[in-house]
């Protein structure tokens, strides 16, 4: 059984921040750029890259949560034995995983170092390091995981910023808020995006077992991407995104993307009806136009 506790002060504080973020995002949804009007094709190109930026930070969150969960489950009657078996299924053997201090006490830091880069079993190329600071076991209400980077690349896109996961579980319901501060993604083509998000993550399956692989989460909220010197796009969950830990990508759910007067949708369940794959369908012009997106 995965154990959870309650921290009402933290819950209230995060709720206020989350509400403020949503209010600000709503204000900006209909005026997402101060630059010249975008063409439909430009908006689609930007939506494609914004979706990839969003998915890049989701991948980091995925690895951070898996590492934190396996660390929290590592303490047994015979000592502290983190095996990171599930994490290794994603990163492969090339990542150097260290825990400091290497025992069952907190706070602690987990570092996943990919060195000069390698291709993981999930088909993703990673380089540099992901650093996870934990204040407490991640399943404890009020626990905070702060994720930072050291020269980190995902599929040759440079990822920067700070990602903060806060456990707000109560009454048997496992829930986290996820926030990105000063995020940035620079693609190999040189185009750079600023990125911020605030989302609610709720566990909807797997919570009654000690295993990580059967966990399934529902994600709701907003994110924003701002092209350096250009347009700003707002990404809102039209229908909740569904994420199975066993799959490296979202399985279902729809994002609504606003870019100036253009409204687009990203369907993670299409085109393969929710199968585990790195594809999503971007549509615009009321569905008259579409593009298949390859996710990192």
Protein language model annotation of sequence segments:
Residues 28-296:
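Low-complexity, intrinsically disordered segments exposed to solvent
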Residues 21-25:
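C-terminal motif of bacterial Sec signal peptides marking the signal peptidase cleavage site
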Residues 14, 27:
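C-terminal, active-site-flanking charged/polar segments
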Residues 2-13:
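Bacterial N-terminal signal peptides that target proteins for export
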Residues 16-20:
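Alpha-helical transmembrane segments
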């Amino acid at each position: 059984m995965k154990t959870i506790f309650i921290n009402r002060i933290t819950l209230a504080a995060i709720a206020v921040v989350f509400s403020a973020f949503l209010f600000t995002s709503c204000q900006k949804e209909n005026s997402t750029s101060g630059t010249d009007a975008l063409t439909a094709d430009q908006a689609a190109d930007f939506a494609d890259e914004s979706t990839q930026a969003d998915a890049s930070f989701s991948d980091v969150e995925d690895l951070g949560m898996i590492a934190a969960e396996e660390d929290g489950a590592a303490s047994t009657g015979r000592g502290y034995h983190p095996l990171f078996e599930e994490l290794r299924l994603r990163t492969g053997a090339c990542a150097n995983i260290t825990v400091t201090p290497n025992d069952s006490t907190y706070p602690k830091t987990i570092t996943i170092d990919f060195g000069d880069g390698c291709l993981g079993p999930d088909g993703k190329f990673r380089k540099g390091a992901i650093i996870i600071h934990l204040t407490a076991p991640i399943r404890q209400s009020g626990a905070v995981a702060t994720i930072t980077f050291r020269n980190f690349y995902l599929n040759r896109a440079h990822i920067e910023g700070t990602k903060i996961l806060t456990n707000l579980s109560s009454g048997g319901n496992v829930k986290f808020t996820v926030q990105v501060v000063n995020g940035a993604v620079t693609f190999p083509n040189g185009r750079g995006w600023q990125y911020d998000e605030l989302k609610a993550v709720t566990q909807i399956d797997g919570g009654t077992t000690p295993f990580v692989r059967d966990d399934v989460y529902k994600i709701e909220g907003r994110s924003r991407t701002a092209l350096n010197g250009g347009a700003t796009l707002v990404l809102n969950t039209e229908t909740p995104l569904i994420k199975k830990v066993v799959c490296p990508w979202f399985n279902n759910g729809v994002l609504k993307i606003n870019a100036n007067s253009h409204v687009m949708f990203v369907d993670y369940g299409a085109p393969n009806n929710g199968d585990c794959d790195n594809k999503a369908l971007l549509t615009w012009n009321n569905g008259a136009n579409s593009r298949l997106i390859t996710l990192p």
